[in-house]
Curated annotation (Swiss-Prot):
Biological process terms in GO annotation: post-embryonic development; reproductive structure development
Region annotation (Polar) ranges: 1-38
Residues covered by region (Disordered): 1-28, 155-181
Protein location: Lipid droplet; Membrane
Major localization listed first in the record, in broad terms: other
Segments of skewed composition (Basic and acidic residues): 16-26, 172-181
Protein known as: Oleosin
Family membership noted in the UniProt record: Belongs to the oleosin family.
Listed transmembrane segments: 38-58, 69-89, 90-110
UniProt-annotated stretches for the region Hydrophobic: 39-110
Length: 181
């Protein structure tokens, strides 16, 4: 019989089949084998490159030791020439950098405008429709107001009221309607 401890211990442990364990062992073995082969292959390459770097460094030091007297002798000619060439190269590099920066900026702006060009007509159509609706609304309100003024004028004309002219021509000073001085 199994105890509570045995049941708990056996149910909480992961269940592996024998095939899963052997597959895991094979993967681990193949990974370590591939790492070993990579180290064996790259060790000579790294050693050769390190040796070439050392030879290049030693050659540079020997060349500098041999060329130093020539630099001292020809320094009145070499220094201005090196400065001139250095400044020219710096100018060309700066010019190229500014040109590439300008081209990339223009390219960015062109792409941004091209992407927004699809949404601009929709926005323009919306604004155009809104302005047209506002114009129609203002026209209708103007027409209604004109009709209201016309009907009010007819009503006043029918009743014989003359006070309208006094209100238009008069003011706070108490001028008469016909007096324009």
């Amino acid at each position: 019989t199994t105890t509570t401890y045995d049941r708990h211990f056996t149910t909480t442990q992961p269940h592996y089949r024998q095939d899963d364990r052997s597959r895991y062992d094979q993967q681990t073995h193949s990974q370590s084998t591939s790492r070993t082969l990579a180290i064996i292959a790259l060790l000579p390459v790294g050693g050769i490159l390190l040796g070439l770097a050392a030879l290049t460094f030693i050659g540079t030091l020997i060349g500098l030791a041999l060329a130093t007297p020539l630099f001292v002798i020809f320094s009145p000619i070499i220094v201005p020439a090196v400065l001139t060439i250095g400044l020219a190269v710096t100018g060309f590099l700066a010019s190229g950098t500014f040109g590439l920066t300008g081209l990339s900026s223009l390219s960015y702006l062109f792409n941004m405008v091209r992407q927004t060009a699809g949404s601009v007509p929709e926005s323009l159509d919306y604004v155009k429709g809104t302005l047209q609706d506002a114009g129609e609304y203002a026209g209708q309100k103007t027409k209604d107001f004109g009709q209201k003024i016309q009907s009010t004028a007819h009503e006043m004309g029918d009743q014989g009221q003359v006070g309208v002219h006094a209100q238009v021509g008069g003011g706070k000073e108490g001028r008469k309607s016909g007096d324009r001085t």
